[in-house]
Amino acid sequence: YICLARPGASNQTIMRTLLDNIANLDKDDIVILNWTWINRWDFYNLQEEKWSTVRPASNEATEFDKLYYKYFQSELWDKLETLKSMYLANSILNSYGIKFVQTSIDDLVFNTEDHPPDYILALQNSLNNDILYFGNKGFYAWAKDNNFPMSKGVGHPLEKAHKEAYEHANKKFTQS
């Protein structure tokens, strides 16, 4: 069991972490991707030469964060980009023959109440069978409802919840 999760990471960070580690995986490994809130995004900061994450709940909101959420952020774009990352991960892991499951903290990813465009529905439908739920809950709601330790501030589920999520996901492969 190896946990590569990082509090506050975006879905783009999750995707880059998978790509950075895909060559080190073998067919006996099980990958669990716990996708985060759809409104967290990365950009490459040329001045600092590193990736930076914008997120609405940040206590350290920069001017860039404020401008981004005021003028550019939209639920439709967030949902599309998140679903694209999930689909890319699905495709890559399948092409490598790696067993995997995906969970999502954010219910908005698969929400269809706002009559999403057909391209959103197509991605949602292609991924729906690969999403692991904990009962009828996503990872975050399950961890919170089961009183797992959470980080201070934004309340990210800590290592114990990630380990239990792995055990839950592992049952999918050992019982099939």
Indicate where each model-derived feature is located.
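Alpha-helical cap/lid subdomain in secreted, periplasmic
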Residues: R16-S176
